[in-house]
Amino acid sequence: NNLAALSRQCGIDLTIGKVVSHKDTHGGFHGDGVSYTVVQYPDDSIGEQMEESETWHTLPLPENLDTFLYQPYDDEVSIPEIQDGYYYFYDRHSESRNPYDDSELFQRFSFNFTFAIYDQSSNQIYLIEYDT
């Protein structure tokens, strides 16, 4: 499952949450599609782990991620404006020089990345795996 994979990738056990929504449009010939998952956590203990993590970053989002998230390129992705929390970005594109850097996101003809944003006010994570 994608929570277990992301947990291994980002170093925080995200599997303790409950999936409240999941959509996945992957499955085409080239594996293109969007996976969108919302996970609810019982408290903010996950946020405390993110605060100590080197791969999760405090909001606000950098400009590229903010543009992608709030002017979405896909109708499947709908995330509320989040003021307090953390985000995680991992660029899986074959041309990526640094997978944790979003600066080249719009310099390519396709997207292949994992993005998660945690809302501390609702204790929810919104997870996107985007492949084009």
Name the predicted role of every residue range:
Residues 1-60:
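N-terminal export/targeting and maturation segments
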Residues 55-131:
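Functional cores of ribonucleases/endoribonucleases
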